[in-house]
Amino acid sequence: MATITPREVFTFTANLRLKLSKAEKKQRVENLIKDLGLERCADTKVGNTFIRGLSGGERKRASIGVELITNPSLLFLDEPTTGLDSTTALNVLELLKKLAQNGRNIVSTIHQPSSEIFSQFDNLLLMVRGNVIYQVITYKKYSSKLKIGTCRFSS
């Protein structure tokens, strides 16, 4: 993976997973590169410890892009901000928020989020040993409709 570019990995994934014409696949790849803000580095190798390549945030956005190529309505992400500095983590969450605002359902696990990252989420579900112990619809999302914050505890 270190020697392939985001454009190449998106094209490869599109060829494997999409039943579209070559032109439609190419257009999907170009749109995805633009949507993910990867225009500047679309032809840069991903890289690794030994090969200089994408930054951590660019690499994270490219990995999300591999899943987005099929235009799923639901996206599951496990720790999408792990290993990123706070600014890059916020940038990744802003991308996910934009996707959610455009109708995509995003489910993500985040362990020990900063208050800045925590504030980006619309809904929170806290689980312990597989049981829901706390659920909240954030005040920010519905405050204009409800005029109050809401939360529900489960026992």
Model-derived regions, located:
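A short, proline-enriched helix->beta-strand linker immediately N-terminal to the Walker B motif
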Residues: 68-74
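Hydrophobic anchor residue at the start of the ABC signature
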Residues: 64-65, 92
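Conserved switch/coupling elements of ABC/ABC-like ATPase nucleotide-binding domains
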Residues: 125, 129-134
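Q-loop/switch helix immediately C-terminal to the Walker
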Residues: 2-19, 28
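ABC ATPase signature
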Residues: 4, 46, 54, 67-68
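Catalytic Walker B motif of ABC-type/P-loop ATPase nucleotide-binding domains
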Residues: 75-79
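Helix N-cap at the start of a conserved alpha-helix in ABC-type nucleotide-binding domains
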Residues: 86-87
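Conserved ABC ATPase "signature" region
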Residues: 11, 26-45
